[in-house]
Regions:
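Walker A (P-loop) phosphate-binding loop of ABC-type ATPase nucleotide-binding domains
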Residues: 1-3
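Helix-to-loop junction immediately C-terminal to a conserved catalytic motif
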Residues: 12-13
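Conserved "ABC signature" C-loop
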Residues: 49-95
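ABC-family ATPase nucleotide-binding domain "signature/switch" substructure
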Residues: 59, 93-169
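ABC ATPase nucleotide-binding domain signature
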Residues: 41-50, 64, 155-156
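Conserved ABC transporter NBD signature motif
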Residues: 20-28, 38
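ABC ATPase nucleotide-binding domain
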Residues: 35-43, 53-54
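ABC ATPase nucleotide-binding domain helices that frame the ATP-binding cleft
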Residues: 5-8, 108
C-alpha cells in the first residue's frame, strides 16, 4: 500500500519508524506529546478488530466507568441494540465471535472507541466490511462526533465527501 495504515499507527504511537517531515496533533509535534495523555484522548479502531473472551459489555467498556445508559445508547446509535438481548452478560467465546459478521465486529470495536469519548479517532478501514447503508450511517455518526476523525479508507460515500477535510496519498 501507500502507507495509510502505517501513518495512523505512527500518529497513535503504536509503531515507531522514520519519516520525512513533521507530524503534529493540534499544533504539537508528535514527539513532544506525552504518551499517557495521548492514549486517554484517542479512540483507535483497526480494520481487523479483536474481541476478547469477555461479555459484550466488558469488550466495549474495557474497565472504564461507564453508565449503563451511555453504554446502551452507543449500542443503539451503532445499530447494535439487538446484541443487548443476544449477548448481554454472556462471555463471548471463540464460537460466538465467529458467528458475528465482520460489520458487527467493526461496530463493536467502534463502540469501544466511542465509549471513551475521545478527542481524536484513528480509524483504519472501518467500513470495509459493512454494506453501503451501514457504512453511510457509521460515517454520518462519526461526522457528528465532537472530535477530530482521522479516517483511512479506500472509498467514501460520495454524498458525504464534502464534509471531510481530506488527506490523500
Amino acid at each position: 500500500g501507500s502507507g495509510k495504515s502505517t501513518f495512523l499507527r505512527l500518529i497513535g504511537k503504536l509503531q515507531e519508524g522514520t519519516y520525512q517531515g513533521n507530524i503534529r496533533i493540534n499544533g504539537i509535534l508528535l514527539e513532544e506529546i506525552n504518551m499517557d495523555s495521548l492514549y486517554g484522548k484517542m479512540g483507535i479502531v483497526f480494520q481487523e478488530p479483536y474481541l476478547f473472551g469477555f461479555s459484550l459489555k466488558e469488550n466495549i467498556i474495557m474497565g472504564r466507568n461507564v453508565k449503563d445508559s451511555d453504554y446502551e445508547a452507543i449500542l443503539k446509535k451503532l445499530n447494535l441494540g439487538y446484541l443487548l438481548e443476544r449477548f448481554s452478560d454472556v462471555e463471548l467465546d471463540t464460537e460466538m465471535v465467529a458467528k458475528l459478521s465482520g460489520g458487527e465486529k467493526q461496530r463493536i470495536a467502534l463502540a469501544r472507541a466511542m465509549v471513551g469519548k475521545p478527542q481524536v479517532y484513528l480509524l483504519d478501514e472501518i467500513t470495509s466490511s459493512l454494506d453501503e447503508q451501514n457504512a453511510r450511517e457509521m460515517e454520518e455518526i462519526l461526522l457528528a462526533e465532537d472530535a477530530m476523525v482521522l479516517y483511512v479508507c479506500h472509498k467514501i460515500i460520495p454524498e458525504l465527501k464534502g464534509q471531510y477535510e481530506m488527506l490523500t496519498f
